[in-house]
């Protein structure tokens, strides 16, 4: 460990509607084990002792957030998000302390463990991680196929050195803000924070995360997330439980 992160702000882009879920309300407000998905996600972040503040980017039309019990938490503040994820993250970065590190986490990943947050922070307190930042990720386990026209298999892709990018992703506020702004100005497709850092020449570290840190995207994911949360709540050694 060469340099302890002194100030850490979590950023949650939550201005999207989650169209693939096909629900009548934004997916982050769907109920999961007696409270909305977003409430679980915020609990994971607000309860972590290393996180000083949580900034959540909301749609200007959001009528659900104020109903959450977490909405009045003293560590939490809100900003107006944008049309795309990167716009929402950038809005939050603009009000964050410029000397802090930003831990950006998906609103629809409610099963994040404190242990994974600890691992990610520890990676960024090493010499290489302090220079490059890091993301939670998971090695690809399944055989990968690339499709051609009509949905037929074009080729099998070697899965060696392939990873699924997860969140949180952790970078210094000042560099992430600059690189995101520059990439958006250049009309670069930014799918996560690491892609903005890569575009600027960075090589963020990959930190192996838990398989249960799933993103709720489709209806069946709700059932799986519920099982993971129930299992964590019944395990006294788990750092995900309520």
UniProtKB/Swiss-Prot annotation:
Pathway: Isoprenoid biosynthesis; isopentenyl diphosphate biosynthesis via DXP pathway; isopentenyl diphosphate from 1-deoxy-D-xylulose 5-phosphate: step 2/6. GO terms for molecular function: 2-C-methyl-D-erythritol 4-phosphate cytidylyltransferase activity. The record marks 159, 215 as: Positions MEP for the nucleophilic attack. PANTHER family: 2-C-METHYL-D-ERYTHRITOL 4-PHOSPHATE CYTIDYLYLTRANSFERASE, CHLOROPLASTIC. Belongs to the IspD/TarI cytidylyltransferase family. IspD subfamily. Catalyzes the formation of 4-diphosphocytidyl-2-C-methyl-D-erythritol from CTP and 2-C-methyl-D-erythritol 4-phosphate (MEP). This is 2-C-methyl-D-erythritol 4-phosphate cytidylyltransferase. It comes from Shewanella loihica (strain ATCC BAA-1088 / PV-4). The lineage of its organism: Bacteria, Pseudomonadati, Pseudomonadota, Gammaproteobacteria, Alteromonadales.
